[in-house]
């Protein structure tokens, strides 16, 4: 929400659906939000998930009454790390496949930082994940192999008209208690430098679980906001105009107590 504040105005509003709940509760909140927005007369709605997302929720809810009469699905765009890690679990590969199978276009984030070999390995990984869930689709022309800043008007027009693909694949029931999670840590009393150091340590500690990403905001010694973004490849801390005292940890089989020790001690 904070990163999208510049878009707000008379013709654009931002709404948020709270996470940290079970699957059915989140689906109900999503449906309720779409009904409320439909009654407000919006003519375009962009759904931007954060963290681990069940794609079936999106399609299932939009086929419920009365939403099936109010909304029409336009484009499904999937953003994939151009330097995608190779050693993902079966469950993680399933999520990767499910979030790519229906996409009309796929954008490789941080493509400018990746080598040609890394990009090709990522594309091979995507198609291998699709094959593992018995999906017949193979991705190639749908993939934007360039940095977001390099996208041309022609590229954006292609994305705008890319639509989506109603693809079939084998579903996997993910155990909510043992699977993927997003943990939120509010108002941490930690400096920007110390946060960066502690995040690097906990991402290497198997006792914390498998951490995919850590993101959030913290103030530096001068009282200015800094934005943290950490993956298995790198950890960055960059200035940002506004922020909120929150750190979000995304991963698989996360151990909150262990992670909290790094962030609070």
What are these regions (language model features)?
Residues 245-251:
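Short, well-ordered beta-strand elements
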Residues 4-9, 99, 133-137:
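Short, conserved catalytic or adaptor-binding loops enriched in Gly and charged residues
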Residues 86, 90-102:
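Flexible active-site lid/hinge loop adjacent to a nucleotide/diphosphate
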Residues 25-28, 53, 57, 71, ...:
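Charged, alpha-helix-enriched surfaces in structured cytosolic catalytic cores
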Residues 65-71, 96-98, 123-132:
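A short alpha->loop->secondary-structure connector
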Residues 102-108, 113-242, 253-256, 264-265:
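C-terminal accessory "lid"/substrate-recognition subdomains
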Residues 3-4, 58, 122, 126, ...:
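Hydrophobic packing residues within well-ordered alpha-helices of enzyme cores
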Residues 1-89:
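Nucleotide-state-sensitive switch-loop elements of NTP-binding domains
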